[in-house]
A protein has these predicted regions:
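Short beta-strand-to-coil "C-cap" segments at the C-terminal boundary of structured domains/repeats
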Residues: 128-134
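Short hydrophobic/aromatic beta-strand or adjacent loop that forms the aromatic wall/cage
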Residues: 124-126
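Compositionally biased regions
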Residues: 15-17, 21, 41
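Bacterial N-terminal signal peptides that target proteins for export
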Residues: 1-7
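N-terminal helix-cap/turn-to-beta initiation motif at the start of protein domains
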Residues: 20-34
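Contiguous, well-ordered beta-strand patches that form the walls/edges
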Residues: 34-52, 58-118
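Bacterial N-terminal signal peptides
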Residues: 7-16
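Short, solvent-exposed loop/turn segments at conserved positions within beta-propeller repeat blades
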Residues: 120-122
Length: 134
């Protein structure tokens, strides 16, 4: 289960944002974020993992728990905004950025979540992240 969380979170990486609103979100995402809540398939992460889960946005890249950067696109014309992760395993998601709080919910194989929650057998992962003040 821990490996599943790490692998799924590792896919949330690198930003290419269209349009002016997207450019503003790109700037707002910069920095380090720490998970304060997470679920995958309706279940919480293994003990101790949540406290270690960090995401760092730098320029057009993002790394999860120190992993290699991965690219994704953000489309702010949708509500909630869409995130598409561009790697070998297609992931699509939604996100909401409000100040120092970032909600992310992603699914695999083109199954975009419709809400910021997960249920058993959905292959969706949800995270609530808070900005780390450095």
């Amino acid at each position: 289960m821990e490996r599943r969380f790490i692998l799924l979170f590792a896919f949330l990486l690198s930003v290419s944002l269209p349009g002016n609103a997207g450019a503003q979100n790109k700037v707002a995402l910069q920095g380090k974020w720490r998970a304060v809540e997470a679920t995958s398939n309706g279940e919480p992460p293994p003990a101790g993992l949540l406290e270690k889960l960090t995401i760092v946005f730098v320029g057009e890249t993002v790394s999860v728990m120190g992993s290699s950067p991965t690219r994704f696109t953000i489309d702010t014309s949708f509500r909630p905004a869409h995130i598409d992760i561009l790697n070998s395993r297609r992931q699509v998601g939604i996100y909401e950025l409000k100040g120092d709080a970032l909600k992310l919910c992603v699914g695999t194989d083109g199954d975009r979540p419709k809400a910021f929650r997960t249920e058993k057998y959905t292959d969706h992962t949800y995270m609530l992240l808070k900005r780390v003040k450095e």
